[in-house]
């Protein structure tokens, strides 16, 4: 089985020794997306809803670079700084996964890169 490294300028560049995504075995494995503006590489300021929106936009950009959509996502993992924000995160998340939502885990963590409030990781089925 071979693997293909995926990179797009429409999503933030990796801030460490990892790829934006890797395609292997018929799946696209997306690294965690945080709310960075892809052009400036700065954290999008504001509330958890604003940061969730940007993280999901970044995820969508990586998917679209491979001809995929959120409909192709089979699993997501959300990392949030405060579980009290769960409802706010869900409200934004539901706009991206309105029907046939993927399997999902949501974990509260002590700290995320660049002290953001949310990170989104995904696995998508390639066409």
Model-derived regions: residue spans:
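Short, polar/acidic, helix-capping and beta-turn segments at strand->helix junctions
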Residues: 2-127
């Amino acid at each position: 089985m071979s693997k293909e490294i995926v990179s797009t300028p429409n999503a933030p560049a990796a801030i460490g020794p990892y790829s934006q995504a890797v395609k292997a075995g018929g799946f696209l494995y997306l690294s965690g997306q945080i709310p960075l503006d892809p052009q400036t590489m700065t954290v999008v300021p504001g509330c958890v809803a604003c940061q969730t929106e940007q993280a999901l936009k970044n995820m969508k950009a990586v998917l679209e670079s491979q001809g995929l959509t959120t409909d192709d996502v089979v699993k997501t993992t959300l990392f949030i700084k405060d579980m009290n924000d769960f409802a706010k995160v869900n409200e934004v998340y539901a706009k991206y996964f309105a029907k046939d939502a993927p399997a999902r885990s949501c974990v509260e963590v002590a700290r995320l890169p660049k002290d953001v409030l949310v990170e989104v990781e995904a696995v998508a089925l390639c066409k």
